[in-house]
Amino acid sequence: APVADVNINPKNPVINTRSFGESPVNVADKVIAYARGLEDGGVLSVSKHFPGHGDTDVDSHHSLPKLSFSRARLDSVELYPFRKAIQAGLSGMMVGHLPVLEPKRGVPSSLSRKVVHDLLTQEMQFKGLVFTDALAMKGVSANNTSICLQALQAGDDLLLVPRRIKEEVEAILDAVKNGELTEAEIETKCRKVLTYKYALGLSKKPFVRLSGLGNRINTAHTRDLIRRLNQEAITVLRNKNNVLPLDADTREVAVL
C-alpha cells in the first residue's frame, strides 16, 4: 500500500516516517514507482490515505482529526500525489477517516459521498477499487452507527475490518428493502472486486507452499537488494565534526 500522504506536519503521530516526504512531487514519483513495482509482481497496489493524512496531529486510529483546508490547498498539496498516481493507472485507493470537504459536519472522508463519489470517482476519474480504512478505528467508529451502509452509499467498494458485522449486514439489507441502496449498486461493486481477482489470477493460483518459504525468500539476491536499497535510502542531513565518512582506523563503534 504506497503511502501518498505528504507529511508536512512534524507532529504527525501516525504517518510520519511512513510518508515519502514533504514534497508533493517527490511523494508522487515514489508512489508511482512503488505501485508499478507491485503491479509488475502481480500485486494489487492500493494507495492511501485519500485525500491526505499528512498534515494532522491526531491519529485517526484513536480519534477523528480536524481539518479545514481550502480546496486550492488540497489540490496543490494533499491531492497532488493521488492525482498523479491515478493518471499513472493506480489500481486501488484507500480512503481515510478525515473530515475533508465536510469539516463542519465532521463526516469522515471514508463515509462522505462528496469525497468518494463526487471527488475521487467522478472529478478525478478513478476507476479502480475503493477501500475504506479500517472501520474499527475510533476516527470513524466512535460516534457512528450503520457505518458499512454509509460507506457503500458514499461509493466505497470494499469495507475493511468492520465491527458489529451482524448489525451492519442487517442495516444494509434493510436499506436495500427501503430503496436507500440498490441491489444493482452492490452487484456493480462485487463485479469490480471479481474483475480484479481474475485479472490477478487469484482464481487459478495455488496457495503458497509454506515449507521452505524462508529459504526461497532469503536468497543472496534479495539480501544484496536489501543492502543496496538501504545504501540508496540513507540521506545525510548534517555532518558535525566531519564524522562521515566513517574511519575504521580511528573509531570502533558508530551509532546511526
Residues covered by each model-derived region:
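Catalytic domains of carbohydrate-active enzymes, especially glycoside hydrolases
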Residues: A1
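Second-shell residues forming the walls of enzyme active-site clefts
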Residues: E22-K177, T182-E185
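Preference for extracellular/luminal or secreted protein segments
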Residues: Q122-E123, A142-L256
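Exposed boundary/loop context
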Residues: V14, S45-S47, L194, I226
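Short, conserved phosphate-binding/catalytic loop or strand-edge motifs used
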Residues: A4-V14
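Serine-centered coil/turn micro-motif
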Residues: N12-P13, S112, T219
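Charged, often glycine-rich, active-site loop that binds/positions anionic groups
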Residues: I15-F20
